[in-house]
Amino acid sequence: RIPWKELQRHFASGYTLVVDLQLDLIEAGYQFQQDNSSQIELWLNANLIQQVSIEQARQWFNDDASLWACVVAPWVLIQHPD
């Protein structure tokens, strides 16, 4: 887990993606690492992986949220443990 405040510079660069809790974060990271574009496209089209919105980033900042993260350069995949 990592505090959102430590991920803000990645967000500012446009490289943070939020992974829906229906998906396993490590499996999603593996598919990115394998460059499995067909699987990633399916997840993107189903909104299971999305860019972190400004509203979500602001909420995580205000809540001092701690998130699960998986780095697959240049991407940082994030899940918020509910």
What is the predicted function of each stretch?
Residues 21-23, 44-48, 74-76:
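Generic secondary-structure microfeatures
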Residues 14-16, 41, 74:
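Generic secondary-structure boundary/loop-capping signal
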Residues 1-34:
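N-terminal, charge-rich interaction modules
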Residues 13-17, 37, 49-50, 66:
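A general structural signal for well-ordered secondary-structure junctions
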Residues 27-59:
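Short, hydrophobic/π-rich interface segment
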Residues 50-82:
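Short, compact, well-ordered microdomains
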